[in-house]
């Protein structure tokens, strides 16, 4: 068992009851193009087209053969683009239940599948996009191979769902999914990472290795798992996938149908009844959160409060990789002499406010509690960084765009979510996730 001692479990109010409920019905879903790093779409549909569930919507020009399929049947009502015609979202009004079927197998056949059979079914169904690489966090090329595959069956993000609750209901599908993934590279390790105290289904597979992690966030991030088990570099790549996509893989191969359901956490200080709800990948979040939120101006986030995406306008949908929807209040109010008050209702990791010594949960808002200023190395980053890297030096190199120095200090192991806690504790109010992405893009472009 690997214990993570450095990090932070954010004391935020609105933790979800770990019981699965039906969510609000939604009649609109979307695929968010900007979730897929470096993707350039070649559209196969246009506005007004009627599509079936599992039908191809677009293909990645920069990654030939990787296709993106409809999570539901219906009519394409909008193809939203941003600056430089970047694809923001493809919106579907859900109608009917027509679907495309794919190859299916009995449970007994799964352990005899060839790598090519597994790959072909994943690609044709669009489930290949559930896999991501590290470094760079991109959908892998269909011709590439990984040193190993990581399955993340734990989640320590603030307000997250407990994976064991979800997996208890879909145990056979999860086991089937593990079996299928083990056949993708039979000679390479399949790492299943779970919480030390969790009881989740597994499978008796030759290349399956089970790892227990415990401790504070980011103990549940796949970047943490990769760092301690099979570190990556410029010449070494691993792939990873989350536990709900493993369930979808299991269902695809045994039913021949694309499975788009998600069980997510709907939680946060502004949610009336925080709980786990069933919904669909790409669900319209305005519809999903209707009558669920407290009065006032709220910010709905697809993902964690630490590193999720703001859900509004053409991005008002549940992300492909998001397993939670978090809602906090917009914090635009000015506080008279706020900096000089004891501030018993505010939290700080630096013990500068009275609230630090309280054991209560806090109603966090979007307020940054200060303006941007120079990066100040006072030990905050080291407090929340459990990986064997020098965070202050790495973050400095990221800020100035020193790609060589950043690589030497381990930036290739990281994704935006791995630096979310550094952004949270930063006295200078830097957003290190977006800075990291710029550096990673530059490294990949320049080789």
Swiss-Prot record:
Pfam families: NQRA_2nd, NQRA_N, NQRA_SLBB. One of its GO terms (biological process) is sodium ion transport. GO terms for molecular function: oxidoreductase activity, acting on NAD(P)H, quinone or similar compound as acceptor. Its EC number is 7.2.1.1. It catalyses: a ubiquinone + n Na(+)(in) + NADH + H(+) = a ubiquinol + n Na(+)(out) + NAD(+). The keyword Ion transport applies. It is an enzyme of class 7 (translocase). The keyword tRNA processing does not apply. It comes from the Bacteria. Keywords: Ion transport, NAD, Sodium, Sodium transport, Translocase, Transport, Ubiquinone. Gene3D superfamilies: 2.40.50.100. Belongs to the NqrA family. NQR complex catalyzes the reduction of ubiquinone-1 to ubiquinol by two successive reactions, coupled with the transport of Na(+) ions from the cytoplasm to the periplasm. NqrA to NqrE are probably involved in the second step, the conversion of ubisemiquinone to ubiquinol. Composed of six subunits; NqrA, NqrB, NqrC, NqrD, NqrE and NqrF. NCBIfam families: nqrA, PRK05352.1-2. This is Na(+)-translocating NADH-quinone reductase subunit A.
């Amino acid at each position: 068992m690997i214990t993570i001692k450095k990090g932070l479990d954010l004391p935020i109010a609105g933790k979800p009851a770990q019981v699965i409920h039906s969510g609000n019905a939604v009649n609109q879903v979307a695929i968010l193009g900007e979730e897929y790093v470096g993707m350039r779409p070649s559209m196969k549909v246009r506005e007004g087209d009627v599509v079936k569930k599992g039908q191809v919507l677009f293909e990645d020009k920069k990654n030939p053969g990787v296709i993106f399929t409809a999570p539901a049947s219906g009519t394409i009502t909008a193809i939203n683009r941003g600056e430089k015609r970047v694809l923001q979202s493809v919106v579907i009004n859900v109608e009917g239940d027509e679907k495309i079927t794919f190859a299916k197998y009995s449970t007994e056949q799964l352990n005899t599948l060839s790598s090519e059979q597994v790959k072909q079914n994943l690609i044709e169904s669009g489930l290949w996009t559930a896999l991501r690489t590290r470094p760079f966090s991109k959908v892998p090329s269909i011709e590439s191979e990984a040193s190993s595959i990581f399955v993340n069956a734990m989640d320590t993000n603030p307000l997250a769902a407990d994976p064991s609750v979800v997996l208890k209901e879909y145990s056979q599908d999860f086991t089937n999914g593990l079996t299928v993934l083990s056949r993708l590279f039979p000679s390479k390790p399949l790492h299943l990472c779970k919480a030390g105290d969790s009881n989740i289904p597994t499978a008796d597979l030759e290349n399956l290795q089970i790892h227990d992690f415990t401790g504070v966030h980011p103990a549940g991030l796949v970047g943490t798992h990769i760092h301690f088990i099979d570190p990556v570099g410029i010449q070494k790549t691993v792939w990873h996938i989350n536990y709900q996509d493993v369930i979808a893989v299991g269902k695809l191969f045994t039913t021949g149908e694309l499975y788009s359901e998600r069980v997510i956490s709907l939680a946060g200080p502004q949610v009336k009844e925080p709980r786990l709800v069933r919904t669909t990948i790409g669900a319209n979040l305005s519809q999903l959160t209707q009558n669920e939120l407290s009065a006032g101006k709220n910010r709905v986030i697809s993902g964690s409060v630490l590193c999720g995406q703001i859900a509004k306008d053409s991005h008002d949908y549940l992300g492909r990789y998001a397993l939670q929807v978090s809602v906090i209040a917009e914090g635009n109010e000015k506080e008279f002499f706020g900096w000089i008050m004891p501030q018993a209702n505010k939290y700080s990791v630096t013990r500068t406010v009275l609230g630090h010594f309280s054991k209560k949960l806090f109603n966090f808002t979007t307020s940054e509690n200060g303006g941007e200023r120079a990066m100040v190395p006072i030990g905050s980053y080291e407090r929340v960084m459990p990986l064997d890297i020098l965070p202050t030096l790495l973050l400095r190199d990221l800020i100035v765009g020193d790609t060589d120095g950043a690589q030497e200090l381990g930036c290739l192991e990281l994704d935006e979510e791995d630096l979310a806690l550094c952004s949270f504790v930063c006295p200078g109010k830097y957003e290190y996730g977006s800075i990291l992405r710029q550096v990673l893009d530059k490294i990949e472009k320049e080789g």
